[in-house]
C-alpha cells in the first residue's frame, strides 16, 4: 500500500522509520521530510500546512493511508480536507484539534468535565492580566493561547518576568494571533511526564510511557523548548498513577468529547505534572510528542502500520512493548530556541549507522550536494536502547562523541530524573 507521512521533524522520521519496517508498505512518501527521512521515503515538495494541496496529491497518487506528525496541519484542518475526498488519514479533525490549538478551549473543557489541571484565568487585555499577576504573585505560568512550537509556555519565577512575558505576548504579539489571548495558571510542583494514547471514538489504547525534558539547559534551567530529550518507559508513572491517569484524565476526555459531539480519532498526548495530589494536566497535544515519539516508537514491537490500520478500522489492538529502555538526546543548533544558526555541515553520521543499538532520527537537516547540513533549531535525535536506563543513557552519550557540527548544543542529564525511582 501507499503511505504518506506529513511533517519534517524527528518525530516524523521515527514514524517513517517504524512504518517502513512493515511488509504492507509498497511506497512511502513524506511531505516534506528531512535528509534522514529522504533515505527511506519519497520526498513530496508540499508544505505540511498546505492541506488542500496535500489532499490533492494523496488523491492523485492513490495514497491509501496518511499519518500526520505535527500539530499545525491538524489545527489547519488537514483531516477534514482528506476525509472530504474519501481518504484515510490518522489524526483528529479541525474541531477536535482545538484541544491543542487553543489553550483556553482546553482549560474550559477540562474544567467542565472534571479533569484535574492547574487553576487558571484567561486574558486578552494586558492591563487586566498585569493586575491579576500583581494580585496572585509568582511563581506563575503564562501561556500563549495558540500554537507556538512548544515555546509558548513561560514559567515566571518573579512578577516582573510575568509582566515582561505578558508584554511580549499581548502587546508585541511575538506569536502573532497565537498570543492575542493568554492563559495564566498556577505553578504546579511535581514531576513532569508524558502519557500518549491512540483514540478512536470511545476506544483508546495507551502507548509506552515517557518523560520529556523541555528546558534548554541541564537541571531544567533556561527557556522552554520543543524538547531536548526523552526516555521510555518512565518510573514516574507507576501502576497506581497510570490507573488514575486513565480514569481521571483519558476516560473523562473521551466522555467529554462525546458529550460535545466531537469525534476524535488520532493520538492524544497528555502533558502531565505528577503532584502530591495525583496527576494533573499541563497541556493536551493532539499528536505524538517530539521527542517522546522517538523512544516510544523504538519500544513498540508491533507492525505499527498494521496496528494503526486495524485501530483506524475500529478493531481491537494491543501494543507489545520492548523490555528495554530507549533514550533520546536532542542535538540543537547554537541560538536555539530564539534564533538558531543553520547551514552547518554535520560530521560523523555514517559512523553512527554502524553502532549497535543506536538509532539516529533527523530533525532540522537537509542535503547540500554531498553534505548533510543543519536547517533548524533541533537538528538530530541520537537514541539508544539499553537493558537498564543507565545503559541506554551511556550508549546514547557515547554515540554523540562521534557526531559534530559547529555550535552543537545538548543536555548532559537526559534521564537523570528517573534514577531516584530506580534501583539500577
UniProtKB/Swiss-Prot annotation:
Signal peptide: none
The EC number(s) this enzyme carries: 6.3.4.13
GO molecular-function term, one example from the UniProt record: phosphoribosylamine-glycine ligase activity
Enzyme class, first EC level, given as a word: ligase
Known pathway: Purine metabolism; IMP biosynthesis via de novo pathway; N(1)-(5-phospho-D-ribosyl)glycinamide from 5-phospho-alpha-D-ribose 1-diphosphate: step 2/2
Binding-site residues, ATP: 133-194
Limits of the ATP-grasp domain: 107-313
InterPro entries for this protein: ATP-grasp, ATP_grasp_subdomain_1, PreATP-grasp_dom_sf, PRibGlycinamid_synth_ATP-grasp, PRibGlycinamide_synth, PRibGlycinamide_synth_C-dom, PRibGlycinamide_synth_C_sf, PRibGlycinamide_synth_CS
CC cofactor note: Binds 1 Mg(2+) or Mn(2+) ion per subunit.
Keyword Ligase applies: yes
Positions that bind Mg(2+): 283, 285
Catalytic activity: 5-phospho-beta-D-ribosylamine + glycine + ATP = N(1)-(5-phospho-beta-D-ribosyl)glycinamide + ADP + phosphate + H(+)
Entry annotated with the keyword Ribosomal protein: no
Pfam family, one: GARS_C
Cofactor(s) for this UniProt protein: Mg(2+); Mn(2+)
Name under which the protein is recorded: Phosphoribosylamine--glycine ligase
Keyword line: ATP-binding, Ligase, Magnesium, Manganese, Metal-binding, Nucleotide-binding, Purine biosynthesis
Entry similarity comment: Belongs to the GARS family.
Superkingdom of the source species: Bacteria
Gene3D superfamilies the record matches: 3.40.50.20, ATP-grasp fold, A domain, ATP-grasp fold, B domain, Phosphoribosylglycinamide synthetase, C-terminal domain
GO biological process, one term: 'de novo' IMP biosynthetic process
Amino acid at each position: 500500500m501507499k503511505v504518506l507521512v506529513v511533517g519534517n521533524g524527528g518525530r516524523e522520521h521515527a514514524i517513517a522509520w517504524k512504518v517502513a519496517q512493515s511488509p504492507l508498505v509498497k511506497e512511502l512518501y513524506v511531505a516534506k521530510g528531512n535528509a534522514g527521512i529522504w533515505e527511506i521515503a519519497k520526498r513530496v515538495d508540499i508544505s505540511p500546512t498546505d492541506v488542500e494541496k496535500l489532499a490533492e496529491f494523496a488523491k492523485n497518487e492513490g495514497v491509501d493511508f496518511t499519518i500526520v506528525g505535527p500539530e499545525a496541519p491538524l489545527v489547519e484542518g488537514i483531516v477534514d480536507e482528506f476525509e472530504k475526498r474519501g481518504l484515510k488519514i490518522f489524526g483528529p479533525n479541525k474541531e477536535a484539534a482545538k484541544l491543542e490549538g487553543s489553550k483556553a478551549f482546553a482549560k474550559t473543557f477540562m474544567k467542565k468535565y472534571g479533569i484535574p489541571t492547574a487553576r487558571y484565568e484567561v486574558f486578552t487585555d494586558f492591563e487586566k492580566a498585569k493586575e491579576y499577576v500583581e494580585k496572585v504573585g509568582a511563581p506563575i505560568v503564562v501561556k500563549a493561547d495558540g500554537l507556538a512550537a512548544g515555546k509558548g509556555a513561560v514559567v515566571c519565577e518573579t512578577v516582573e518576568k510575568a509582566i515582561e512575558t505578558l508584554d511580549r505576548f499581548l502587546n508585541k504579539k511575538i506569536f502573532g494571533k497565537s498570543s492575542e489571548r493568554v492563559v495564566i495558571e498556577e505553578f504546579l510542583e511535581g514531576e513532569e511526564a508524558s502519557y500518549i494514547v491512540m483514540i478512536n471514538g470511545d476506544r483508546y489504547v495507551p502507548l509506552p510511557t515517557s518523560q520529556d525534558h523541555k528546558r534548554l539547559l541541564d537541571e531544567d534551567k533556561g527557556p522552554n523548548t520543543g524538547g531536548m530529550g526523552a526516555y521510555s518507559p518512565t518510573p514516574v508513572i507507576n501502576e497506581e498513577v497510570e490507573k488514575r491517569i486513565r480514569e481521571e484524565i483519558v476516560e473523562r476526555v473521551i466522555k467529554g468529547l462525546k458529550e460535545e459531539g466531537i469525534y476524535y480519532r488520532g493520538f492524544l498526548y497528555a502533558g502531565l505534572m505528577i503532584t502530591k495530589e495525583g496527576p494533573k494536566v499541563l497541556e493536551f497535544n493532539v499528536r505524538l510528542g517530539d521527542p517522546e515519539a522517538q523512544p516510544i516508537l523504538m519500544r513498540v514491537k508491533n507492525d505499527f502500520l498494521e496496528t494503526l490500520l486495524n485501530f483506524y478500522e475500529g478493531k481491537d489492538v494491543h501494543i507489545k512493548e520492548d523490555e528495554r529502555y530507549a533514550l533520546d538526546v536532542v542535538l540543537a543548533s547554537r541560538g536555539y530556541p530564539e534564533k538558531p544558526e543553520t547551514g552547518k555541515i554535520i560530521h560523523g553520521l555514517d559512523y553512527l549507522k554502524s553502532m549497535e543499538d543506536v538509532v539516529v532520527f533527523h530533525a532540522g537537516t537537509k542535503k547540500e550536494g554531498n553534505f548533510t547540513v543543519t536547517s533548524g533549531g533541533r537538528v538530530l535525535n541520537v537514541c539508544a536502547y539499553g537493558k537498564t536506563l543507565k545503559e541506554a543513557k551511556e550508549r546514547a552519550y557515547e554515540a554523540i562523541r562521534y557526531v559534530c557540527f559547529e555550535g552543537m548544543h545538548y543536555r548532559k542529564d537526559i534521564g537523570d530524573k528517573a534514577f531516584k525511582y530506580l534501583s539500577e
